[in-house]
UniProtKB/Swiss-Prot annotation:
Cofactor: pyridoxal 5'-phosphate
Modified residues (N6-(pyridoxal phosphate)lysine): K116
EC number in record: 4.1.1.17
Activity regulation, short description: Inhibited by antizyme (AZ) OAZ1 in response to polyamine levels. AZ inhibits the assembly of the functional homodimer by binding to ODC monomers and targeting them for ubiquitin-independent proteolytic destruction by the 26S proteasome.
BP GO annotations: pantothenate biosynthetic process; putrescine biosynthetic process; putrescine biosynthetic process from arginine, via ornithine
Organism: Saccharomyces cerevisiae (strain ATCC 204508 / S288c)
Any single Pfam family the record assigns to this protein: Orn_Arg_deC_N
CDD domains the UniProt entry points to: PLPDE_III_ODC
Active site as annotated: C411
Protein name as annotated: Ornithine decarboxylase
Name of the top EC class for this enzyme: lyase
Binding site for pyridoxal 5'-phosphate: S247, G286, E318, P319, G320, R321, Y441
Record-level Gene Ontology MF annotations: ornithine decarboxylase activity
Length: 466
């Protein structure tokens, strides 16, 4: 987008913005008052080749070594039941790199990791060491964090609708920060935890998100006055505002609008209801590695306009998948095969949608199987061993002659990992697939449906160490 186009799009705005931090998009821009201008900014960012993704694939060799070592110890013809179960490789070095990238891109925003995303103890411990705080939504999650000798002031109880006994428990453990979005919740808090530091959760436009949350949580802006009035009448402590624009959003103008709406609530609380100045803005979660540059650019713009440096407001966020999705690789064993024709088959693995790939159902993810081990040979280095889509130029049927559907181990017909995939190799029983980037909302929601245990082992590596 040329500077002339930027100027024309922003002609109605009067404020000037400093350059985008930590990127090569350094020309000055005026603040963004309309959706078209934000859309143009996002197009510019998507087309800017200088804004590169974090090179997380540099860890591949160590991941392969760990996969190879684990599989090399398994003989599926003689092993005990369960020894050939699926397992994860967790790269703690990837978590470190992602944290450093967060600090670089969003230095003002303190992350509170969403424990529900992946409650692995070693990941939680590492994040705590790095200075990350925690977003908990239940007694169990609070317990998990506190059991690691983490101070309760590093927890936000980010569930707007809480069980009364959990509120009492939070009070007994001095967990003070808590979200709400309705009057009834305020009455419970007044009764069981009246000293809470409350964050009013507002609804957002998450219509482009894959995982929408405002259909369930968040007070609409037209109803904010009801909650502010109740806060004042009950004598409770309103500390700030929170929101969540959903996960997998394709339009980050929703972030800008949410920050703008939060500013409205801040001003309304002080000017119309005489409440003490609010001190916390919680910008929620939904951050994804693949779209981090776009979402953070818009977020920085919005914060600089509505909550500039020195405004006296602490900015926090609730990232989950951002820190763990690309840090975990799942390995799954081929347990059966049903041939349909010469080059077409149904493949069955020992993990599926009721296990560590429940993210297919609940999180709208599409795991990408790759060939790890075929016919006694490893193929990890071939990142193009499989494809979901054929075309006439780059990925042809002659290169990928074998068409398969991939299924989980349970007896439910819903347990399908991929309805159509194309393979370079004719998969056989005893082979292994690996699925990269399966660290978010996978093991945390696995079930034991049909009697299949899903306590997948985790092998830890650290690609940041020599």
């Amino acid at each position: 987008m040329s500077s002339t186009q930027v100027g024309n799009a922003l002609s109605s705005s009067t404020t000037t913005l400093v350059d985008l931090s930590n990127s090569t998009v350094t020309q000055k821009k005026q603040y963004y008052k309309d959706g078209e201008t934000l859309h143009n900014l996002l197009l510019e960012l998507k087309n800017n080749q200088d804004l590169e993704l974090l090179p997380h694939e540099q860890a591949h060799p160590k991941i392969f070594q760990a996969l190879k070592a684990r599989i090399g110890r398994i003989n599926n013809e003689t092993c005990d039941p369960g020894e050939e179960n699926s397992f994860f490789i967790c790269d703690l070095g990837e978590v470190k790199r992602l944290f450093n990238n967060w600090v670089k891109e969003l230095p003002r925003i303190k992350p509170f990791y969403a424990v529900k995303c992946n409650p692995d103890t070693k990941v939680l411990s590492l994040l705590a060491e790095l200075g990350v705080n925690f977003d908990c939504a239940s007694k169990v999650e609070i317990d998990r964090v506190l059991s690691m000798n983490i101070s309760p002031d590093r927890i936000v109880y980010a569930n707007p609708c809480k069980v009364a006994s959990f509120i009492r428990y939070a009070a007994s453990k001095n967990v003070m920060k808590s979200t709400f979005d309705n009057v009834e919740e305020l009455h419970k808090i007044k009764k069981f935890h009246p000293e809470s530091q409350l964050l009013l959760r507002i609804a957002t436009d998450d219509s482009t998100a894959q995982c929408r949350l405002s259909t369930k949580y968040g007070c609409e802006m037209e109803n904010v006055d009801v909650l502010l009035k109740a806060i004042k009448e009950l004598g409770l402590n309103l500390a700030g505002v929170s929101f969540h624009v959903g996960s997998g959003a394709s339009d980050f103008t929703s972030l800008y609008k949410a920050v703008r709406d939060a500013r409205t609530v801040f001003d309304k609380a002080a000017n119309e209801y005489g409440l003490p100045p609010l001190k916390i803005l919680d910008v929620g979660g939904g951050f994804q590695f693949e779209s981090f540059k776009e979402s953070t650019a818009v977020l920085r713009l919005a914060l600089e306009e509505f909550f500039p440096v020195g405004c006296g407001v602490d900015i926090i966020a609730e990232p989950g998948r951002y820190f763990v999705a690309t840090a975990f690789t799942l390995a799954s064993h081929v347990i059966a095969k049903r041939k349909l024709s010469e080059n077409e088959a149904m493949i069955y693995t020992n993990d599926g949608v009721y296990g560590n790939m429940n993210c297919i159902l609940f999180d709208h993810q599409e795991p990408h199987p790759r060939t790890l081990y075929h016919n006694l040979e490893f193929h990890y280095d071939d990142f193009e061993s499989t494809t979901a889509v054929l075309d006439s130029i780059n990925k042809t049927r002659s290169e990928y002659p074998y068409k398969v559907s991939i299924w989980g181990p349970t007896c439910d017909g819903l347990d399908c990992i991929a309805k159509e995939y194309y393979m370079k190799h004719d998969v056989i029983v005893g082979d292994w697939f690996y699925f990269p980037a399966l660290g978010a909302y996978t093991s945390s929601a696995a079930t034991q449906f049909n009697g299949f245990e899903q306590t997948a082992d985790i092998v830890y590596i650290d690609s940041e160490l020599d």
